[in-house]
């Protein structure tokens, strides 16, 4: 029975993430004594039932979670304070990811993962110390019951693909008019998105698309005309709302600029405070004998 029970937890269940760490067979009540059967058909049926039950359980758990639950989990995982302007970034991203995770139509996909990683990296640029930045990202994912490595690996895979393609080739790949042997699973995901009328579009998904285009051809996204043309092609192929995608990306770029300006202001304030501190330390270490000499002149 142990062998049958563990089989789906490694491969079949990987796309659903962990369920409160419950991969122990003793908690899968539906696997009764007959599951000890060595019949291949029976084993296959049990595995599929395990996948279905675990997916339903995870969905129910996530659906019942509140924003407060997610925040509480996050601050239990990441216990250090978050610096000034970055705190709002973290909490807004956390809320956005939470609301998606509890939406019945939402499904994780690699482009969404790239959007999450890209948004985090861009908005958290300059955060110190680096180990805290890593801890914050890990906390965001784990607070939602997901694995940060899955996000990072999927994002890195898509980035590597985009960097070896031209902008034109990438758009063709996203349209599924061009394919590559090592990306069949990714294109299957694109096909599922395009054919799903209930696909839950998100700003983070749009950021993932933008990041792909950016990695393939930076000049393409810098020019408004070529950027718009490419986005229209991709949106048409994936049945995405172009106007919504365009507005979300305009806001994304605008917010990146504002964040860059805020970092400059923050750095100026830090430098000013450092100079004041150094001045006070210099005055405090002034020679007492020098003060006496000045008073006698």
Describe these PLM feature segments.
Residues 20-24:
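Intrinsic low-complexity, disordered N-terminal segments enriched in polar/charged/small residues
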Residues 37, 86-103, 178-195:
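Short amphipathic alpha-helical segments and their helix-coil junctions
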Residues 46-154, 208, 229, 235-245, ...:
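N-terminal domain-start signal
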Residues 123-127, 213-221:
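Short loop/beta submotifs within extracellular cysteine-rich repeat domains
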Residues 156-203, 210-214:
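Short, solvent-exposed interaction modules
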């Amino acid at each position: 029975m142990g062998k049958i029970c563990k089989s789906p937890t490694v491969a079949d269940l990987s796309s659903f993430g962990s369920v409160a760490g419950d991969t122990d067979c003793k908690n899968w009540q539906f696997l009764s004594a007959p599951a000890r059967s060595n019949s291949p058909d029976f084993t296959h049926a049990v595995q599929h039932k395990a996948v279905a039950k675990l997916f339903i359980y995870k969905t129910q758990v996530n659906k019942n979670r509140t924003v407060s639950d997610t925040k509480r989990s996050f601050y239990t995982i990441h216990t250090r304070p978050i610096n000034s302007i970055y705190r709002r970034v973290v909490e807004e991203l956390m809320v956005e990811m939470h609301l998606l995770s509890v939406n019945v139509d939402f499904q994780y996909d690699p482009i969404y993962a790239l959007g999450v990683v890209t948004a985090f990296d861009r908005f958290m640029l300059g955060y110190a110390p680096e180990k805290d930045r890593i801890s914050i990202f890990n906390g965001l994912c784990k607070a939602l019951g997901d694995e940060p490595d899955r996000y990072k690996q999927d994002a890195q895979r898509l980035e590597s693909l985009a960097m070896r393609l031209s902008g034109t080739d990438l758009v063709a790949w996203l349209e599924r008019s061009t394919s590559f042997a090592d990306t069949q699973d990714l294109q299957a995901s694109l096909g599922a998105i395009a054919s799903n009328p209930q696909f839950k579009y998100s700003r983070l998904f749009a950021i993932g698309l933008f990041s792909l285009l950016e990695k393939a051809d930076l000049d393409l996204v810098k020019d408004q005309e070529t950027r718009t043309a490419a986005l229209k092609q991709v949106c048409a192929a994936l049945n995405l709302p172009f106007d919504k995608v365009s507005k979300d990306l305009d806001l994304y770029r605008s917010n990146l600029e504002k964040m860059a300006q805020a970092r400059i202001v923050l750095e100026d304030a830090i430098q000013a405070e450092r100079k004041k501190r150094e001045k006070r330390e210099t005055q405090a270490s002034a020679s007492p004998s020098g003060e006496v000499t000045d008073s006698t002149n």
